[in-house]
Each structure stands twice: as C-alpha cells, then as structure tokens.
Swiss-Prot record:
Coiled coil: none annotated. CDD domains: PKc. The keyword Nucleotide-binding applies. Residues 1-25, 658-680 are annotated as: Disordered. InterPro entries: ARM-type_fold, Kinase-like_dom_sf, Prot_kinase_dom. The protein kinase domain is predicted to be catalytically inactive. Keywords: ATP-binding, Nucleotide-binding. One of its GO terms (molecular function) is ATP binding. Residues 28-297 form the Protein kinase domain. Gene3D superfamilies: Phosphorylase Kinase, domain 1, Transferase(Phosphotransferase) domain 1. This is Serine/threonine kinase-like domain-containing protein STKLD1.
Length: 680
C-alpha cells in the first residue's frame, strides 16, 4: 500500500491494493469509455484470461497520501456479502507514465442496464413503471441499504445509474464511495460545472460534503420520486424539481397531486413516504427501517426479497407446532414453505436439535444442511435465527464425527460465505462468534488449501487477531479463535504473513490470562508449532516462545497432543537458532528444559510419536558444540541411545514430525544421523 507523501511520483513495486502480480491493468483490455463519473473516468474492460467484462473507475489522485487514504477506507467494502450489493472486485493503484498521473482503480461488475435506463425509456414513452416490478426491486434496494446502514456504512453516491439490473427482476447497489473521495471539493466542483444533473441526487447537507445515513435516505427519496413521476415529467423538469426541494419542500406537494390525478399506482403510499424522506433537515428525515415499515407493513408492497417478510403477520405457535410434528423430511418441507417467517424457522430448528441422531440422516444430510444455510441467508439480521442455525450445524457435525469419524463435513462457498456474513451482520455477538469460529475450524481442516486461502482473503486472520486482542476476558473467544487460527495455518499457504507477527505476543497474553488452562495451552502450542514451520516467529521472539512452550509442557504433561506440538515447535526453533537452544537447556526457576525432557520421556515412553519428537529436539540441540557438555552431563546421550534401541523403526528415524501429516517431510536431521558435534 502506498505510504504517506505529498509529492507526485511513480509508485514502487508492491504499493497497491489487492491484485495480480505485476501491473494490475495489464490483465485488462480496455473496450470503451463510458460517460465520466463525478470522481473520474469509467472504462469498460475485458479480463484477458477469462473474457469477463468489468467496469474500472479510475480516480486521479494528486498524491500518494490521498490515494492510500482512499484505498484504506474502501478496502473493508471488499468483504461485504449481500445478494443486492455489487461489491468491488479489486482495488489497486496504478501509474500512467504517459501523462505522469497516479490513479486509484476500482473494479466493478459490468451490466448494460440500470435504473437510469429504465427511467429514461419510460420517460420517452410517457409510460408508468410497472407497479409490481417497482415494488419488487424497491424491496431489494431497501434490503441492501438497510444492510449497509446496519453495518454503519454509508453509500454516499446513490442515484439511478448506480442501481444495476442483473436480470429483469434482480438489482444491486453499486459504486459505494468513501468519505475521502466524496469530500474532494475541487473534483466535485469541476464535475458539477460539466454536468449539473449529477449533483441533483445529493442531499442538501451533502453539497457541503457532510454525509450520513440520512443523506442516503434523501438520495433514495429522489430516486423513488423520479421513478413515480417519469411518465409525466421530462428529465430537465425532474432535475430542477430535485434541486428546488433543497430550499422549498413545498414543491413536492404539486407533484404528489399530479401523481394522484394521473392515477400512479400506490400513490397513497408515496404521498406518505416521500415528504418524510425529503426533509431539508437530516434529523427530520426517517430511517431506512421507517421506509420499510411504511412501504411493506403499512403499505401493501410485496417483494421477492424475503427478508422484508419479517414484517408479515406471525404464524400462530399452535399451528407451527402441529406442522412440525413429523419426521425430518416433513419439517424441512415446512421450513421451505414458510421460509419468510423467522419464528417458524426457529421452532423448526429447535425441533431438529431435539431429534435423535438416527433420525437426522447422518453423517451429513445434504438437504438439511442446505435448508439451514438458506435460512441463515434469508434472515441474516435476525440474531436468534443465526444462533439457532449455528447450534444445529454444530450439533449435526458433532453427531457426525461421533458416529462417522471418517465422514467429511460439506463445505462450499455458500456455507463459508453465509458464516462470514453472520459475523459481519452481528459483529458484537460473542456466542455467535464462537460458534462460527468452531464451524469454520472444523470444515477448514477437512477441505482443500483453496478454502483456507479464501478465508484469509476475506480477512479472517485479521478478524481472529482483533478479537484475541479485544476479548482476552472471554475464554470461549480465545479458545475458538486459537483453534481456527491453527486450522488456517495448517495447510502452510499464507496469503499475507504480516499479521502473524503479532501472534506470539497475543498468545503470551492469552496464556498469562489463563495460566492453568490446559485446553488453551494445547491450542497455543499447536499455533506456535505451525508458526515456527512457516518462519513467522521473529528471532527476538524465540526466547519468549521457547519459555511459553516449556511452561505449557510443565502444566499439562499428560496431554499427548500438547506435548507433541510443543516439542515439534521447540525442535523447529532450536534447529534454526542457538539462542533458542540455550533457552531450552538453561537452568531457570521451573527447572531446565533437559530435566523436563527426561520427565516427558518417562511419562510417554511407550508413545512412539512423543518419543520421536523428543528425540528430534535432542538431535537439534546436539548440533551446537557449546551445548554438548551440558547434554552429556545431563545424561542425554544415554537417553538418546535408549530411544534408538527401543524404537528402531523408521517412525523415529525419519523427520516427519516437521511436516503436516500427508505432506513430504522436510530436510530435518534424522534421529541417529551424525550432526556437527552430535552425540554419536
């Protein structure tokens, strides 16, 4: 990412947002240029490898600082997941050497049609927009905007051309903007002179570069007004009307009266709605929830956007209970027929949670999982639905692992995307966070490397570290967070190692908070081992990590998994650092690591895996000549000889302890091989 600076210069390699190696623009072929937007040039491009069309908005930046600020503010938008929001597909900064200009590039979904084309076509034909179609797509827009406002995200650039049509009955909000870009006064003033139509959708306060959720409400009100009046008002008249409303809202009354005279469908709803949306003072405007209430509860609007059916009349509990008395198949049928009623979904899932394992169709009943995931998607903002659905998925997974340990949990993009959306919709809900982390940890360990990469690209590593740091007082968050972190690291494919530099210090804080917690120590040792293999522990952190690993072994020597991972981590660090080796053998308050090795061997002497990892640590310690006398005086030579005599199989002599199971072993010294200054 670009660093701060005030002078124009060509960015060096790596100073950009996510993108492919090399110059990001090189993978696109420019087809043609659209009308320029308020902030820059819009290019229709084709990705050369896939032949997929995109729109790239190129925003010229005066300096690196401006570009990096805008990029940093826009990056979180890449993680949005909603059926009616078209998120940016890529963000990057590029340099145009021909004109010596720096550009922030925003790659978006390409579509031929938007609300703008629909309005213009009806305006030319002087025809009314179909009421059923308008209710449907307006419901989708309201749902998307409610989702954004729920996350405290402001669109800032709502207008008909930024609501694209994916199909005749499916629309998406597009081109979300940032505060940095939308408060560039010079750029806005230039564009306003070129095209006064563009600023006509903006709220009065937005003209002074003050944006809030209420400014989105004004813009949406202008869009609804244009859609309802396009059959009798031309484009210039409509633009002047929008501008006049900023000073004299009374001009709206005449238009509403004309709408009534022209018998515009749903005019009564719009007469109630639009004056409340188009108040000059933003504090007097209604919220997006109020808009939904007026149109879909008090009004008679209907939409395929089922989340709006939260406002429907509830199904009596007695009827629901009667319908849910059958087997799994009949319960799923009820869930599908009443998909828009969250109370029905809750009762159905609670009924499924009580059913015995033999009735659930284990190991993983695909149809049941699909229905539960769909329910989570449809009711993503209903916390009780999310909690119950995750509980049911964990219940199914737990039962499956008990009765069918060889079974793999189904995991596809729909499932992971839904789980991530749940985290995003309810960022402060700890019980949900813990369950989602647990589900993702289990599925990640059973899936391919691509899933781990997908989750990392979605920002899950940073999410885990943020919550480990902010939720130290929550044991469940720490335990589930460490478990998921281990699962993400297990494949050894790390998209960005930089965030992992914080992990040793975070784990140190976790272990200090829970000094006698064996489960926490076990999870921590697993993460330390994988970090050591990945080279993600800095040299200045070696002593701290070695001390924590030894401390964990002393705490829970009876936990074989903890002991194995701790000795693997120690061996990995000692292999590359004499400082780490000295930390193992030095005498400290709890005793030396060498005495601990003896204790571990005696306790687990019949466990080949533990003995192998202990022996591997001894081999690496023996590679340092200055440590040899201490090893000999501590009878380590005799211990190593005993290990070699008792375990002559290849299990002990190979180096598989330093690889993920199933992957080829690394080049670690084999037990029994002569190393520099070894015990041989």
């Amino acid at each position: 990412m670009l660093g701060p600076g005030s002078n124009r210069r060509r960015p060096t390699q790596g100073e950009r947002g996510p993108g492919s190696p090399g110059e990001p623009m090189e993978k696109y072929q420019v087809l043609y240029q659209l009308n320029p937007g308020a902030l820059g040039v819009n290019l229709v491009v084709e990705e050369m490898e896939t032949k997929v069309k995109h729109v790239i908005k190129q925003v010229e930046c005066m300096d690196d600082h401006y570009a990096s600020q805008a990029l940093e503010e826009l990056m979180p938008l890449l993680k949005l997941r909603h059926a009616h929001i078209s998120v940016y597909q890529e963000l990057f900064i590029t340099w145009n050497g021909e004109i010596s200009s720096l550009y922030l590039c925003l790659v978006m979904e390409f579509n031929e049609l938007s609300f703008q084309e629909v309005i213009e076509d009806k305006r030319k034909a002087k025809k009314i927009i179909d009421s059923e179609w308008m209710q449907n797509v307006l419901g989708q827009v309201l749902d998307a905007l409610e989702y954004l406002h729920h996350l405290d995200i402001i669109h800032r650039n709502l207008k008909p051309s930024n609501i694209i049509l994916i199909s005749s009955d499916h629309c998406k909000l597009q081109d979300l903007s940032s505060n940095v870009l939308m408060t560039d006064k010079a750029k806005w003033n230039i564009r306003a002179e070129e095209d006064p139509f563009r600023k006509s959708w903006m709220a009065p306060e937005a003209l002074n570069f003050s944006f809030s959720q209420k400014s989105d409400i004004w813009s949406l009100g202008c869009i609804i007004l244009d859609m309802t009046s396009c059959s009798f008002m031309d484009g210039t008249e409509a633009m002047h009307l929008r501008k006049s409303l900023r000073q004299s809202p009374g001009s709206l009354k005449a238009v509403l009266k004309t709408m009534e005279e022209k018998q515009i469908p749903d005019v009564e709803t719009f007469r109630n709605l639009l004056p409340l949306m188009l108040q000059i003072d933003p504090s007097d405007r209604i919220t997006i929830k109020d808009v939904v209430h007026i149109t879909f509860l008090r009004g008679s609007f209907k939409s395929s956007c089922v989340s709006l059916t939260l406002h429907r009349q509830m199904v009596p509990a007695s009827i629901t209970d009667m319908l849910l008395e059958g087997n799994v198949a009949s319960i799923l049928e009820v869930m599908q027929k009443f998909s828009g009623w969250p109370e029905v979904q809750l009762r159905a899932m609670k009924r499924l949670l009580k059913m015995p394992a033999d009735q659930l169709g284990l190991p993983w009943p695909p149809e049941l999982v699909e229905v539960v995931v769909t329910t989570m998607e449809l009711h993503d903002r209903v916390l009780d639905v999310q909690l119950c659905a995750c509980s049911l998925l964990l219940h199914l997974l737990g039962q499956a692992l008990v009765h069918h340990p060889e079974a793999k949990a189904p995991c596809n993009q729909a499932i992971t995307s839904t789980l991530l959306s749940a985290l995003q919709s309810h960022p402060e809900e700890e019980p949900l966070l813990v369950m989602v982390y647990s589900l993702l940890a289990i599925t990640t360990t059973q899936e391919s490397e691509s899933l781990s990469e997908e989750l990392q690209n979605a920002g899950l590593l940073e999410h885990i570290l943020e919550h480990l740091n902010s939720s130290l007082e929550s044991r469940d968050v720490c335990a589930s967070g460490l478990g998921l972190l281990w699962a993400l690291l297990l494949d050894g494919i790390i998209v960005n190692k930089a965030p992992l530099e914080k992990v040793p210090d975070l784990i140190s804080q976790v272990l200090a908070t829970y000094p006698a917690d064996g489960e926490m120590a076990e999870a921590s040792c697993g993460v330390f081992w994988l970090l050591s293999l990945l080279g993600c522990i800095k040299e200045q952190q070696f002593e701290q990590v070695v001390a924590l690993l030894l401390q964990s072994i002393r705490l829970c020597q009876d936990r074989a998994l903890l002991v194995n991972n701790a000795y693997r981590g120690l061996a990995s660090l000692v292999k590359v650092s004499e400082l780490a080796a000295f930390k193992v053998v030095v005498q400290e308050e709890g005793g030396s690591g060498l005495s601990l090795i003896k204790e571990t061997y005696q306790l687990h002497r019949d466990d080949p895996e533990v003995v192998e990892n202990v022996g591997m640590l001894l081999v690496h310690l023996a590679s340092y000549e200055e440590i040899l006398p201490e090893l000999v005086s501590s009878s380590m030579k005799a211990l190593l000889q005993e290990i070699k005599e008792r375990f002559t199989s290849s299990l002990v002599s190979d180096s598989s302890a330093f690889s993920k199971p199933g992957l080829p072993p690394g080049g670690s010294p084999q037990l029994g091989c002569t190393t520099s200054g070894g015990l041989e």
